[in-house]
UniProtKB/Swiss-Prot annotation:
Similarity comment: family membership: Belongs to the CobT family.
Gene, per the UniProt record: cobT
Source species, domain of life: Bacteria
UniProt name for this protein: Nicotinate-nucleotide--dimethylbenzimidazole phosphoribosyltransferase
Organism from which the protein derives: Dechloromonas aromatica (strain RCB)
InterPro entries in alphabetical order: Nict_dMeBzImd_PRibTrfase (IPR003200), Nict_dMeBzImd_PRibTrfase_bact (IPR017846), Nict_dMeBzImd_PRibTrfase_N (IPR023195), Nict_dMeBzImd_PRibTrfase_sf (IPR036087)
Length: 348
């Protein structure tokens, strides 16, 4: 697997950051998770006065061979149709990114459609969708490696343009099924507790999805498959998930703040953090999704999400919605008065 130089942020500033937070005109801990977020960002940037510069949202899109087997309520064509919707500015992520001042790019990591050259679209296509993992590995090791390299290159270009905070989103019919398999393999949670309704499967559809995923697992185990993060990514992942893994690793290497969305983005973060555990020190977990298995993902990563809105859309919507809270964490640290500067008496 690839080599990324990801170091745990130097904790030398931690006491000074905590003291700065504690001297603000408020009771200790009164800003809750915003205080932890402010401290995390200060440590990532190694400063008492962090800044969020050129914030960008990346939406990674890819098709899944297993979608044709019936793991989703929607036809595979919806992937490319939604990419067109993103490019036209009409999706939920477009609305929230515009509202909150986030730049937005769509990454074609492996959609089964030819988009040509388009403004706002990054061509990082490994292939026109993965293979059907119910019958064979979703991708070859070489394809998986290529996707990771592609993602890293995209983020390095953003870093060169002064971006120090990046949000992750995705689109791919069938990718909740893929994320369910990855979550099961990496956390040990029973598959049934990792499999949800995705885009809205009825009871029969949910049972069929679970049965198909059990078949995929049996095939993999019978072939001697293990739970190594890189191996399960190639076996069950999507090109959008693998490309996202590379992007996350490069973002942490560049000491950027990573805005982690929901269940599918969470599966990429789970993989990336198994490959480089220090990555978690750079992640802000934006929300707890309504999708089955996301709670276990968050527990496995020791994550405290900022929001719990019952979201299950994907696209990076939870990350975009949480971004103003991240801004608020930085703003209170930089702008709020201390007891001393405001002439306010602290408690006895």
């Amino acid at each position: 697997m690839h080599s990324f130089e990801i170091s745990i942020p130097d904790s030398g500033l931690e006491t000074a950051l905590q003291n700065k937070i504690d001297r603000k005109t408020k009771p200790l801990g009164a800003l809750g998770l915003l205080e932890k977020t402010a401290k995390k960002i200060g440590l990532v940037q190694q400063t008492l006065t962090p800044q969020l510069n050129n914030p960008q949202m990346l939406v990674f899109a890819g098709d899944h061979g297993a979608a044709k087997a019936g793991v989703s309520a929607y036809p595979q064509d919806v992937t490319w149709q939604m990419v067109e919707n993103f490019l036209a500015g009409g999706a939920a992520i477009n609305v929230f990114a515009r509202q909150n001042g986030l730049g937005l790019s769509v990454v074609d990591a492996g959609v089964a459609h030819d988009f040509g050259q388009r403004t706002g679209l990054i061509d990082a296509k490994v292939a026109a969708g993965t293979a059907n993992y119910i019958e064979q590995a979703a991708m070859t090791p070489a394809q998986c490696a290529q996707a990771i390299q592609n993602g890293a290159a995209i983020v390095r270009q953003l870093a060169a343009k002064g971006c120090n905070v990046v949000g992750f989103g995705e689109m791919g019919i069938g990718n909740t099924a893929s994320a369910s398999l990855l979550t099961h393999c990496l956390t040990g949670l029973p598959l049934a507790e990792c499999v949800g309704r995705g885009t809205g499967l009825d009871d029969a559809g949910l049972a069929r999805k679970q049965d198909l995923l059990e078949q995929a697992l049996i095939r993999y185990r019978n072939a001697g498959g293990n739970n190594d993060a890189g191996a399960v990514l190639a076996e069950f992942g999507g090109f959008e998930i693998a490309t996202m893994v590379g992007a996350m690793l490069a973002a942490a290497e560049a000491k950027m703040v990573l805005l982690i969305d929901g269940f599918i983005v969470g599966s990429a973060a789970l993989i990336a953090s198994r490959l480089a555990p220090a990555l978690l020190d750079y992640c802000v977990f934006c929300h707890r999704s309504a999708e089955a298995g996301h709670r276990t993902q968050l527990l496995a990563m020791g994550a405290e999400p900022l929001l719990d809105l019952g979201l299950r859309l994907g696209e990076g919507t939870g990350a975009a919605l949480a971004y103003p809270l991240v801004q608020s964490a930085v703003s209170f640290l930089n702008e709020m008065a201390s007891f001393e500067s405001a002439g306010v008496s602290d408690k006895e």
